[in-house]
């Protein structure tokens, strides 16, 4: 089988997705890999079968399919690499020059295999073995991460705190507004007075910590620390996988679960802060054309980078900003309904706002701020618009 049947094109079709997933496994959920993996496999399968129908020669069809896959899946990476070499290559290698050159190279190699290669079957065994070898490392990285995550989660299932029996159990909301500035910082740095909103909260019985400071400067460090009542150094969470386990199944969550609370969570667009295994995980309605951030990253490594950069993609395709708007608006709409849910709730709501990219105007309309060359003043105004909206 290894010597006669060229199955390597199908394994090569899987490699780009698995390799990218392994490289980013600390930032993504494994379920984000399934759709692009299936599509990549189908691309390889369809091209392979089509070549066999045309050529009536499995070994030759396999080699031509491999050339096509290499062209299709590496174009975006080659494009980025060439543009990063020097200012000269930045202007030289544009899509209008690189795409034809890359296409001619691929077509030339295909022609050589079709017309000139005498014994295509001689390549089958070596390429079959190499394709298997190619998948070993990414599959090992991905599976190891899954096992480590399971182990870390299991170790955190038991909280050191115990609920007080018989006590009243009100709903508890832990709402995080990512990158929301303190009043004095907003006033002194951005010249925005947020005191009317804070005073309104005080009138409703809220406590405002006027001189509060974040425990850490990054979400991956800050939230796990907060959800476990201690600093990460004390908790022994130096590794990324340990911090994620502390975030998703930490002491606070375990405490409420042990006391009979239902855990409620929402999608954030970032796997690290998504509690998809919550008792009630309230997702939003995804546009059928929407790509996840992992899928977008993957697509940009392929030849599909060209229509993306040329902005010729169907206008119905949801952008990253559009999806962020949908997530935020869905969370705000659904969190209002939770008081009607029976039982005691612990609600974990991480809203990536006013954190950029800036998706909202002050009244909630889509924000118009998109330019990369914006001035500091324009950036400040866009940030304040997010604050005004979320208030």
Kindly give the residue locations of the regions a language model identified.
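A long, amphipathic alpha-helix that forms part
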Residues: 150-168, 326, 332-336, 370-391
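Short, charged/polar micro-motifs that form catalytic or ligand-binding hotspots
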Residues: 36, 162-166, 187, 242, ...
């Amino acid at each position: 089988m290894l010597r006669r049947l060229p199955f390597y094109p199908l394994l090569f079709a899987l490699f780009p997705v698995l390799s990218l997933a392994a490289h980013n496994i600390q930032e993504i959920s494994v379920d984000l890999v399934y759709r692009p993996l299936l599509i990549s496999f189908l691309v390889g399968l369809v091209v392979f079968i089509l070549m066999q129908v045309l050529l009536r020669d499995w070994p030759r069809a396999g080699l031509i399919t491999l050339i096509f896959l290499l062209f299709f899946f590496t174009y975006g990476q080659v494009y980025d690499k060439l543009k990063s070499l020097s200012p000269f290559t930045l202007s030289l290698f544009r899509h209008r020059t690189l795409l034809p050159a890359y296409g001619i190279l691929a077509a030339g190699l295909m022609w050589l295999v079709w017309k000139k290669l005498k014994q295509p079957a001689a390549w089958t065994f070596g390429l079959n073995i190499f394709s298997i070898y190619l998948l070993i490392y990414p599959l090992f990285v991905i599976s190891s991460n899954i096992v480590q995550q399971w182990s870390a989660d299991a170790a955190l299932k038991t909280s050191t705190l115990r609920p007080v029996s018989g006590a009243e159990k009100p709903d508890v909301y832990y709402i995080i507004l990512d990158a929301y500035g303190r009043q004095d910082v907003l006033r002194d740095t951005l010249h925005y007075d947020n005191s009317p909103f804070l005073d309104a909260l005080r009138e409703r019985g809220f406590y405002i910590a006027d001189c509060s400071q974040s425990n850490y400067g990054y979400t991956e460090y800050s939230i796990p620390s907060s959800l476990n009542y201690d600093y990460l150094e004390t908790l022994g969470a130096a590794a990324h996988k340990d911090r994620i386990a502390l975030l998703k199944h930490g002491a606070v969550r375990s405490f409420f679960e042990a006391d009979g609370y239902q855990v409620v969570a929402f999608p954030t667009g970032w796997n690290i802060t998504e509690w998809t295994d919550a008792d009630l995980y309230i997702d939003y309605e995804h546009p059928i054309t929407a790509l996840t951030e992992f899928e977008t990253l993957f697509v940009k490594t392929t030849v599909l980078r060209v229509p993306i950069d040329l902005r010729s993609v169907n206008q119905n395709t949801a952008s990253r900003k559009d999806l962020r708007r949908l997530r935020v608006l869905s969370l705000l709409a659904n969190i209002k309904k939770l008081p009607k849910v029976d039982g005691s709730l612990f609600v974990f709501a991480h809203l990536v706002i006013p954190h950029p990219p800036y998706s909202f105007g002050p009244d909630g309309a889509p924000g118009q701020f998109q330019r990369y060359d914006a001035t500091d003043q324009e950036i400040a105004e866009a940030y304040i618009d997010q604050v005004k909206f979320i208030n």
